[in-house]
């Protein structure tokens, strides 16, 4: 019984190391390869940066960790670890299979309308706040995702046009739809109007009512047209009902009263009008009740061997994922390295848990709770905004949690 607390605390240290950063995917392998954001295995005792206070569960003594910048190039194991981490954060089983791209004109139009972004000459997208750094307000309780889905059509049904969209609900999470809109372009053809008159039409958008698959609800909007342009129609109720049914396909029937008489043409799915293809924008919220305690952490500057944060940039082009990740072009994932001597218990931000503080207080008093050593691990993680294609060719914009290591500490 005397050894039980030590063994229990030792197990807690190991569990905290593995589960605290890598997440559930780490349990599939007893010795997962290091990732840029995960704490790398420390050097063996006696090597630079090594310490007898280093947690043995952090990496063992068989050869030191080679930093990415020391490799000259990133090896295959390192790349695979980075890929697994990104996919797990996006809740994807594998990279989306992009066999045919969304028409560039349609994508550019949607991005300009929603994000004031721009497309560079080399085809890359630049959007403010999607630069690979932490998202503004990333530590808040709410995370908002934005999903853009482009229309397909089943053709004409009586006086209505059937549009359908495949809308991802972000890994079947319990999302609450904050706002959802259909964007529809109305084009004016040459038409002789009486002096002082305008073209006024009524657009109706029909969607399936929740709980009644054979019943349709309708959103109506009177549109006063001066020129060709985009118009939005609220469909929040339709998207929320879709998510609650656990479905992905959204069917919308669009009808425009008086359009034909007034030479107004709603643009649907026309190969000659790709830049005006209809699209749906969904803003959804997922609450997060977790609170983080802000701590200060050390930055690795080449002059310290203590636990610190090492910056490291991950380039999506380097790993061959720039075809489905639209923005950013890469991000600072960072990782933790360094030793954790017992006296760090008194340094602000170095003790990352109550468990660590208790163990170190035992040590400072000359007591031995068991063979427990501290590990240098991430103590603060932040979200990052990403814009990417999913398997249904939706453009998804979301704040992805736990992507960037902000601070490191000992546990």
Swiss-Prot record:
Residues 28-69 are annotated as: Disordered. It comes from the Eukaryota. Disulfide bonds join 300-308, 307-376, 336-408, 340-410. Residues 30-47 have a biased composition (Pro residues). Glycans are attached at residue 97. Residues 1-28 form the signal peptide. Uterus, testis, ovary, lung, kidney, brain, CJ7 embryonic stem cells, and possibly in liver. SMART domains: TGFB. It is found in: Secreted. The keyword Glycoprotein applies. Residues 29-296 form a propeptide. GO terms for molecular function: growth factor activity; hormone activity; protein homodimerization activity. Disruption phenotype: Inhbb deletion mutant mice are viable. However, the deficiency affects prenatal development with a defect in eyelid fusion at birth and female reproduction. At 2 months of age, Inhbb-deletion mice display 2-fold higher insulin serum levels compared with WT controls. GO terms for biological process: activin receptor signaling pathway; apoptotic signaling pathway; cellular response to calcium ion; cellular response to cAMP; cellular response to cholesterol; cellular response to insulin stimulus; cellular response to interleukin-1; cellular response to leptin stimulus. The keyword Repressor does not apply. Belongs to the TGF-beta family. Inhibins and activins inhibit and activate, respectively, the secretion of follitropin by the pituitary gland. Inhibins/activins are involved in regulating a number of diverse functions such as hypothalamic and pituitary hormone secretion, gonadal hormone secretion, germ cell development and maturation, erythroid differentiation, insulin secretion, nerve cell survival, embryonic axial development or bone growth, depending on their subunit composition. Inhibins appear to oppose the functions of activins. Dimeric, linked by one or more disulfide bonds. Inhibin B is a dimer of alpha and beta-B. Activin B is a homodimer of beta-B. Activin AB is a dimer of beta-A and beta-B. Interacts with FST and FSTL3. Activin B interacts with BMPR2. This is Inhibin beta B chain. It comes from Mus musculus (Mouse). The lineage of its organism: Eukaryota, Metazoa, Chordata, Craniata, Vertebrata.
């Amino acid at each position: 019984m005397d050894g039980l607390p030590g063994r229990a605390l030792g197990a807690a240290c190991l569990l905290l190391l593995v589960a605290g950063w890598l997440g559930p995917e780490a349990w599939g392998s007893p010795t997962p390869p290091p990732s840029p954001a995960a704490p790398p295995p420390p050097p063996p005792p006696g090597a630079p940066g090594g310490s007898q206070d280093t947690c043995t569960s952090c990496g063992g003594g068989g050869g030191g960790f080679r930093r990415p910048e020391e490799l000259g190039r990133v090896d295959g194991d390192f790349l695979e670890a980075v890929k697994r981490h990104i996919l797990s954060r996006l809740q994807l089983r594998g990279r989306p299979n992009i066999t045919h791209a969304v028409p560039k004109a349609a994508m550019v139009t949607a991005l300009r309308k929603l994000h004031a972004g721009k497309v560079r000459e080399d085809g890359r997208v630049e959007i403010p706040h999607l630069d690979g750094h932490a998202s503004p307000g990333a530590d808040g309780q709410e995370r908002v995702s934005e999903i853009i889905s482009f229309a397909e059509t089943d053709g004409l049904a009586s006086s209505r046009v059937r549009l359908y969209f495949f809308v991802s609900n972000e890994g079947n999470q319990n999302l609450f739809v904050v706002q959802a809109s259909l964007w529809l372009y109305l084009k004016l053809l040459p038409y002789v109007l009486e002096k002082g008159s305008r073209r006024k039409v009524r657009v109706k958008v029909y969607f399936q009512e929740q709980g009644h698959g054979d019943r349709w609800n309708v959103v109506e909007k009177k549109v006063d047209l001066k020129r060709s342009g985009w118009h939005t129609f609220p469909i929040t109720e339709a998207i929320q009902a879709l998510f609650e049914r656990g479905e992905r396909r959204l069917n919308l029937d669009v009808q425009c009263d008086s359009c034909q008489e007034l030479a107004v043409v709603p643009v649907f799915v026309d190969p000659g009008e790709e830049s005006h293809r209809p699209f749906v924008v969904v803003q959804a919220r997922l609450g997060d009740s977790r609170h983080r305690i802000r701590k200060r952490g050390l930055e690795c500057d080449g002059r310290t061997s203590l636990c610190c944060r090492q910056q490291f940039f991950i380039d999506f082009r380097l790993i061959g994922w720039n075809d489905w990740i639209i923005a950013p072009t890469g991000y600072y994932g960072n990782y933790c390295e360094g030793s954790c001597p017992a006296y760090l218990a008194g340094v602000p931000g170095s003790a990352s848990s109550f468990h660590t503080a208790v163990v170190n207080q035992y040590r400072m008093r000359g007591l031995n709770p068991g063979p427990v050593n501290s590990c240098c691990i991430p103590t603060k993680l932040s979200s990052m905004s990403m814009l990417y294609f999913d398997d249904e060719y939706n453009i998804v914009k979301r704040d992805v949690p736990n992507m960037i290591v902000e601070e490191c500490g000992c546990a």
